[in-house]
Amino acid sequence: MKKLILYPLSILLFLSTNLAAQTCCQLETMGDYQLLGGSLDFIRAHAEPLPFTFVSKEGGEMVSFPTKDSTGKAGGFLIKAKKKSKKWLLVYQEWWGLNDYVKKQAEAFYTDLGGEVNVLALDMYDGKVATKREDAGKYMGEAKEERLESIMQGAVKFAGKRAQFASVGWCFGGGLSLKSAIVEGKRAVGCLMYYGMPIKDVEKLKTLNTDVKGYFSGREKWINKTVVEEFAKNMTTAGKVLDYKIYDAEHGFANPSNPAFDKAATEETYAASIKYLKMKFGI
């Protein structure tokens, strides 16, 4: 395992043949990652999720909370700790939206953390969930940086003044997880990211209050080895720690609805994530 660090988010969008030829090597911010929503290559690399319905066994339910922007509110899937707790895990969706696969994974984290942590899977698309990859690309591309950050800020306030946070996300959510750690400020205690686009802005990375643990794909052409190694250098420059591993697997390897699902890599990363979170939360 190597040591390293992570990234932000921004805005802008879209399209055309130019974009289809663009790779993640050329993309520098979260907003740049959103540009991939118009890339045919990137869209076609994502198989559509199989139908799945999740029913919570731990009392998970949809909740809403205020935000300071013009929308005024946001939502998420919340599973409360069995006893009152200041520990919160914020879970960030893939580009599909807050679907039942994400809710199931959020509940798995809750269960394997012994019910000692409040787990909140945030709805970053305000109720929109894609089942078609073209829609997923559209939703990701349309997401505004200001709105995404407002949702994060609302969640932090919803958790309470004494809350401490860790975050986890996949794909689009991997980038959001890093951004979340920055938004959480001094109350951030941990950050996990799965094959998410890193932040290049060293000044923003310097504001992190936590290390970052990352899992990346060695077979994809977007967030590839070059991108990850540059991220590692930027983290070092920022004086932060990134603990990462590049797997011999495709983008989306931890998604069970993905034909590229890699069971061994998924089990290894999940076990490492639970160990990391238990250490960070003192469980």
For the regions a language model picked out, list residue spans one by one.
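Serine-hydrolase catalytic machinery in alpha/beta-hydrolase-like enzymes
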Residues: C24-F42, P49, T53-S56, M62-F158
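Short alpha-helix in the alpha/beta-hydrolase fold that links the catalytic acid
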Residues: Q105, N224-N234
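Alpha/beta-hydrolase fold nucleophile elbow
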Residues: A159-W170
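Gly/Ala-rich beta-loop-alpha elbow adjacent to hydrolase catalytic centers
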Residues: G169-G173, S177
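Short beta-strand/loop motif that positions the catalytic acidic residue
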Residues: G214-F216
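C-terminal catalytic histidine-bearing segment of alpha/beta-hydrolase fold enzymes
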Residues: A238-I283
